[in-house]
């Protein structure tokens, strides 16, 4: 079926897997809520208002939303939260990500997901701790903050590294994607998982039983 009528395309569908753009994903979320179709969202780059709109649609239908659908990244996310909760503020948290030259959002959705996990480990929200840009900043690093750095080049699928650094030691954990197949496989797993679930906003940690 080839059509520009989204509701028609959803007739008989059990789930939609959506890797698109924020505005398109919002239209899809609205249509899924109206047709009781589960919605798996791999799109990144949403602003706060768009995030809130998605949460509203999740009151009516199952939405699985994740900045990264891969098994490895979500296991890493779980580890980041645990490590963050175990370490005190003497350990500075930095997140470095690299993607292909054409990626438009920075930091990546995955980097923000890792940042959110680190913030949860401290009992805070990422908005309270995030430092996204240091260009021109002359002051020292604020204790407890979470820093981000983004690299773009070539055809890199995705690399993410989270470091916890004190005056005397450093813990670093890294994930590197070799193929985009990992995102497809995770999205299919999420769609199958969503079939028996009540309406709500979920993520891959729910799908993989990591929380």
Task: Explain the meaning of each model-derived region.
Residues 1-34:
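N-terminal glycine-/serine-/threonine-rich beta1-alpha1-beta2 phosphate-ribose binding loop
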Residues 23-35, 42-65, 71-83:
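Rossmann-fold NAD(P)-binding glycine/threonine-rich loop
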Residues 35, 59-60, 86-88, 121-125:
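Short helix-capping segments at alpha-helix termini
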Residues 1-7, 89-211:
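C-terminal substrate-binding/catalytic lobe of Rossmann-fold NAD(P)-dependent oxidoreductases
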Residues 14, 20-21, 44, 150-152:
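Short glycine-/small-residue-rich Rossmann-like dinucleotide-binding loops
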Residues 15, 38, 62, 92, ...:
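Residue-level detector of anion-binding/catalytic polar loops
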